[in-house]
């Protein structure tokens, strides 16, 4: 099977947004116009093409990022639909990792919202070029230029309108293209026929002003254009497009478009912009990786002739074909039925069949080429973030980093007979989702599951019931507290046991000190003259790492500290690794009294949107939850309150907010950072943990 679309004519894009900005509807319309769907599915009716897990259709939100392929004007566009709900941030991270560009969808009434900020930051981390689609222009309170302003103010993004809406709310009739200087009016409800006309007189001045500022902004990124612009020469449409493309691909410029996916306006222009401004796999820098046995860096060019390399970015269990592994090919080609190397795990894998996905239908293909996104059937050991490569040319592509869970609950099957079934279900779900963890508490024997928020765990429990037919009871949520040191001290740890024959002897002096936030545990060996022999150093480090997991104050893992091993002693006969391991853990225990240990709790960034009359109640409620209000602003006819609130105080907030605002308030929350717990609360936590 020969290559159908050249690499230059391939686009791998994601569609990212805040919950409810209309992302799934936008994707639907793209599939409709590119000829993959014959009838448009509405999210409100629960019949959307991309939302194919039962729960997604019920809740009207997108949880798993389905990858789908479409064609537009002779190009292949691979689309990854990413969830906008904050509990599924990992899905967004893993899809951004394999994209070349993205369309950020905003709600024309709200502009940039908290989850938009989170997703935007993730996209910046991975250097993903973006175009912005301001959707829902038909909605009451829609304001295009306000939305463009929020991109600049809240995200400090160099964003500029390349379109201007004609009318808004109910009078939204068409779109002015500022690049080509023409107005498009829609002639039918499906938006397939539009007519290009002259820009209406009442919009001429505004369009000219915006076009001038667009040209100026783009010229700043391109010296040749700058010279032409300063000399007052006319800049052609092609030159302008090329400059916007260059700025966008370099992640220095963000073109902003407008429309209403629900009313079928503006989506084809978004597709055109994807082809015009977002990069092909050949436009992005070649992917870097390392050799498995050394840390030597190698690159893989985006070409069919290079050795095969791919990254697995999603694992799913499919009722018909079993385990599906979604992967992005960075270089080379792969035939179904062939063998590849999973270099991350050092295992050989056989690719049974290769499927190209279209939301929930699939087409079997025999070969995938560089730049393609597809799903493989038959991989046994591959999980999210693993590299697959040619057996003779090994490489490990950079993997993804997944956040630790911030909330834990105990779970047990409703009937004891289901215990094994539940264990299997949890193992499968953890394989699909790296931010979900399941383990057995060694002390209580309970099964504990952890995730990114209440909704995340609700959906896991729900999926167990539907997909694995296991009903479970869930305990009260537990917060993932941490501990750290606020002071430095030098401490001794000595373990001596003499009982006839061979004894045990380990002796260390360690200096503990606070580390920067987020840096984790750092161990330094500063032994001189072999007072602790080199072969025991790893045992000291391992002993500390084990002991850190059990905490020093209330049994929570200790984070962000440095430990410097600087002195100690040993015994020729009695010293062994075990003794030094125990000595190190004793040193950590002794540090508890000297290093001023504190308990840390996860703090969430919360944004509440409410009608003005509930403002007082909500502010009072946030303060009673130990929250700090960071800012307030009007948005349309609602008020937005932004606050930092401890996660432990936010359980059940959805219910409280509903009753406080008669169901008219909404909120979103994102884990932000760890902060010290006030003394009174720390005492309660310690008492509770000792009482157990």
UniProtKB/Swiss-Prot annotation:
One of its GO terms (biological process) is ribosome disassembly. GO terms for molecular function: GTP binding; GTPase activity; translation elongation factor activity. InterPro entries: EFG_II, EFG_III, EFG_III/V, EFG_IV, EFG_V, EFG_V-like, EFTu-like_2, G_TR_CS. One of its GO terms (cellular component) is cytoplasm. GTP binds at residues 17-24, 81-85, 135-138. The keyword Oxidoreductase does not apply. Catalyzes the GTP-dependent ribosomal translocation step during translation elongation. During this step, the ribosome changes from the pre-translocational (PRE) to the post-translocational (POST) state as the newly formed A-site-bound peptidyl-tRNA and P-site-bound deacylated tRNA move to the P and E sites, respectively. Catalyzes the coordinated movement of the two tRNA molecules, the mRNA and conformational changes in the ribosome. NCBIfam families: EF-G, PRK12740.1-3, PRK12740.1-5, small_GTP. Belongs to the TRAFAC class translation factor GTPase superfamily. Classic translation factor GTPase family. EF-G/EF-2 subfamily. This is Elongation factor G.
């Amino acid at each position: 099977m020969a290559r159908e679309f050249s690499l230059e004519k391939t686009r791998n894009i994601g569609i990212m947004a805040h919950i409810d900005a209309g992302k799934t509807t936008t994707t639907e319309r793209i599939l409709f116009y590119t000829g993959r769907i014959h009838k448009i599915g509405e999210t409100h009716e629960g019949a959307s093409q991309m939302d194919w897990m039962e729960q997604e259709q019920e809740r009207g939100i997108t949880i798993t990022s389905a990858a789908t392929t479409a064609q537009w004007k002779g190009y292949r566009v691979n689309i990854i639909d990413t969830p906008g709900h904050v509990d599924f941030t990992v899905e967004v991270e893993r899809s951004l990792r394999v994209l070349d560009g993205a369309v950020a969808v905003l709600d024309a009434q709200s502009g940039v919202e908290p989850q938009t900020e989170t997703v935007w930051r993730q996209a910046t981390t991975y250097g993903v070029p973006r175009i912005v689609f301001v959707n829902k222009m038909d909605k009451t309170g829609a304001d295009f230029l306000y939305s463009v302003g929020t991109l600049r103010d809240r995200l400090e993004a160099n964003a500029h309108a390349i379109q201007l809406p004609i009318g808004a709310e109910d009078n939204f009739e068409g779109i002015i293209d500022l690049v080509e200087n023409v107005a498009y009016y829609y002639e039918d409800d499906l938006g397939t026929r539009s007519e290009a006309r002259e820009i209406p007189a009442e919009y001429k001045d505004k369009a000219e002003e915006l076009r001038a500022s667009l040209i100026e902004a783009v010229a700043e990124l391109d010296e040749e254009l700058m010279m032409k612009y300063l000399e007052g020469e006319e800049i052609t449409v092609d030159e302008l497009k090329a400059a916007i493309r260059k700025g966008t691909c370099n992640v220095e410029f963000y073109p902003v478009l407008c429309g209403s996916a629900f009313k079928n306006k503006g989506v084809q222009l978004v597709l055109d912009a994807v082809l015009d401004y977002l990069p092909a796999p050949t436009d992005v820098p070649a992917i870097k990786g390392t050799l498995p046995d050394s840390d030597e860096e190698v690159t893989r060019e985006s070409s069919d002739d290079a050795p095969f390399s791919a990254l697995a970015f999603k694992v799913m269990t499919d009722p018909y074909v079993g385990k599906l592994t979604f992967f992005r090919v960075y270089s080379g080609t792969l035939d179904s039925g062939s063998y590849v190397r999973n270099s991350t795990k050092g295992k050989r894998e056989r690719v049974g069949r290769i499927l190209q996905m279209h939301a929930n239908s699939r087409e079997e293909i025999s070969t995938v080429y560089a730049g393609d996104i597809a799903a493989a059937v038959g991989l046994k050991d591959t999980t999210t973030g693993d590299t697959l490569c040619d057996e003779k040319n090994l490489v490990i592509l950079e993997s993804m980093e997944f956040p630790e869970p911030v909330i834990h609950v105990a779970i047990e099957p409703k009937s004891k007979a289901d215990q094994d079934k539940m264990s299997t279900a949890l193992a499968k779900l953890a394989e699909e989702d790296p931010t979900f963890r399941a383990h057995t508490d060694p002390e209580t024997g309970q099964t504990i599951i952890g995730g990114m928020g209440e909704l995340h765990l609700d959906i896991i429990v729900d999926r167990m019931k539907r997909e694995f037919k296991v009903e479970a009871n869930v305990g009260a949520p537990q917060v993932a507290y941490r501990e750290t040191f606020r002071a430095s001290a030098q401490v001794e740890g000595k373990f001596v046991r003499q009982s006839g024959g061979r004894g045990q002897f380990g002796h260390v002096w360690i200096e503990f000190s606070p580390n920067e936030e987020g840096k984790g545990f750092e161990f330094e060996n500063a032994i001189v003259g072999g007072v602790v022999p080199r072969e025991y150093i790893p045992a000291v480090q391992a002993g500390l790492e084990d002991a850190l997991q059990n905490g020093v104050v209330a049994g929570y893992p200790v984070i962000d500290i440095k430990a410097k091993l600087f002195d100690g002693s040993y015994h020729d006969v009695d010293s062994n690794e075990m003794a030094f391991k125990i000595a190190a853990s004793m040193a950590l225990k002794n540090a508890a009294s000297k290093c001023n240990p504190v308990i840390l709790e996860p703090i969430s960034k919360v944004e509440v949107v409410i009608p003005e009359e509930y403002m007082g109640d909500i502010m009072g409620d946030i303060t009673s939850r130990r929250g700090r209000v960071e800012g307030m602003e009007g948005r349309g006819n609602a008020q937005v309150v932004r606050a930092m609130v401890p996660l432990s105080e936010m359980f059940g907030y959805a219910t409280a907010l509903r009753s406080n605002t008669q169901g008219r308030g909404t909120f979103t929350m994102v884990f932000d950072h760890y902060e010290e717990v006030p003394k009174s609360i720390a005492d309660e936590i310690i008492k509770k943990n000792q009482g157990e």
